[in-house]
Amino acid sequence: VNTGSLPHLFARLAALERRIRAAVAARRAADTNPDDPFRGLYLSDEAIDALLATRREPFVPFQASAASGRLGRLAETAGLSGLDVELLLVALAPDVDSRFEQFYGYLNDDVTRRRATAGLALRLCGLPEASAAGRARLDPASPLRSAGLLVVDDRERPFLSRSLRVPDRVVGHLLGDDLLDATLVGVARVVDEVVPADAGRLHRALRAQVRLAYLRERPGGGARELAAAALRHAGFAVLEVDAARLRAEPDQHALTAAVLREAVSRHAGIVLGPVEDEPPLTALTHPAIPLVVFGPNVWDPRWSADPPLLHDAAPLPVADRAELWQARLGGGLAPGVDPAAATAHFVLGPGQIARAARAASVSALVDGGVVTSEHLRAGARSQNAAGLHRLARRVEPAVGWGDLVLPSGVTGLLHELAARARHRGQVIDEWRMRPGGGRGRGVTGLFAGDSGTGKTMSAEVIAASLGLDLYTVNLATVVDKYVGETEKNLERIFTEAAGVNGVLLFDEADAIFGKRSEVRDAHDRYANIESAYLLQRMETFDGIAVLATNLRANLDEAFTRRLDVVVDFPLPDEPLRRLLWDRCLGVTAPRADVDLDFLASAFELAGGHIRSAAVTAAYLAADAGGPVGMAEVVGAVAREYRKLGRLVGEREFGRYLGLAVADVGR
């Protein structure tokens, strides 16, 4: 509460009281029956005769004086004239001093009308009731009413008999109350702490009286923080409004009026977003209040008749991100830890960096140490939006490069994909090697190979190496038989993924992609549209997206050449199979004599099937109460063969066929 402006407000109300005393004296002098105990409850013949004998004259004229304090700031922001201020004070008085209720009841000649009417207010301001200039100050388009500072009630009554009222929030503000209007809780908030951002162009525009701006939000651009910083630099407080919650309110008109009233009262600019559909711009427009709107889409000219200043909220340069990390973390870093380097592959805006730094500091405090690279990456991951969880399966990576058993050429391509993700800020932003053609800043890849060759695990390893989560989308569940629904499902996924720092893996990509053939029927045409849409959306995606398919031959070359990295996963050869068996059987499980050479040479299995067989063998051994031996492993392989539809024969199982056949009886 700030009461510094109260002396001036009380002085202005005291001056109003003196005019009211004079008005009461004049009324008494003309009263035909001042001692009537029922005056104001009925009209007598004498009262009517007195009305016929006199004219309704204004009270004693007065000289308006300049307002100061909160009243003066409010008048300046809302563009109020001296007359507007006096009308506001007349309407405000009963909410500050209850005696004014009786004063107004007496002057209205109606004890039930305890607020100033329009006619009484004009006369107290020295104007006749028929004054066009005075009536104009009470018009819905007037500064007082358009800003929500004054409400005219009793619309069914004649204009002069309508009551004037000041909203409670305006009364509270003038009395020093800085709490947000209760009706706006959950919809709007006052931004006290502004994250530093490079808002030069927008700041200059707001200084130059630009009152509508639209920021197209890019991942990591921090449009919200950019708008707040520009408003603060331009001398405004910041009122942030959640566009989705505002739209969801049943009485949107009353709520937008409350937002504008709050902004005018605080001398605040409005930050509205993120918007996707038509926002209520007209209801939030005021000549003195800047409105900065932000959203992920391009500006639609139909949203407003007034063209806005258009600005792209581009991702922060690497140097700016490093400066923000250092400013937020201070000296609490572990030796040798570079926050910018540890989180270089995360696309974070200023506000996200501030929150991630707080999360990292809290985690380090709980762990009883200083902030490490892992704390930083965990803090950055905590800024992921939650919407993608409903559309994709989230995987917290638990594997690393050492867990991969792949040919060196394949591993090299995987490292290249991770390097692209790690250094894209430097290459695209600093070196300005943007690909053009409307492509985004993202990294795209294709993993092709038979089931079990390591495609999903490789995506998990890449995510782990970058400190990111893996989000898996099964495209077979996205495809819809109804025309256009598949594209809508994909758009929802990419829209939610834009707010997430993670690796997006589209599994079973052949459910959508296929050789583009001649269009023979509507099914062919729409199948081609779906595949083209997925590729186009991947190209404009700013994140990391990988397609995984079992059918490499089904993919059109025109598609694969537009992806950054294409990795073919072959079936493992004998040396790799031996390594896989050794790795999958593990070092902690008790192991008897297992013939790894035989397993590798006899059974041509992919890595996924080898792992499945090893796990099955471990369960068989645990159930038997002994170590993992050839009996358990061969039995597990036999089960894997049956799952794959293969015959269990002597050619593969050789001298261990008896163990495989014996497993059938288990």
Task: Set out the residue ranges of the language-model regions.
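Extended, charge-enriched "interface" segments that sit outside catalytic cores
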Residues: 1-63
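Short, hydrophobic/amphipathic alpha-helical patches that form generic packing surfaces
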Residues: 11, 83-96, 146, 258-261
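AAA+ P-loop ATPase motor domain of ring mechanoenzymes
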Residues: 42, 46-77, 103-113, 158-239, ...
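Structural motif
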Residues: 74-84, 132-133
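Short helix-coil junctions and helix-kink-helix linkers
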Residues: 120-133
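Short, hydrophobic-biased segments on the C-terminal half of alpha helices
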Residues: 141-142
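A short, conserved structural fragment
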Residues: 145-155
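Conserved nucleotide-sensing/catalytic segment adjacent to the nucleotide-binding pocket
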Residues: 256-284, 496-517
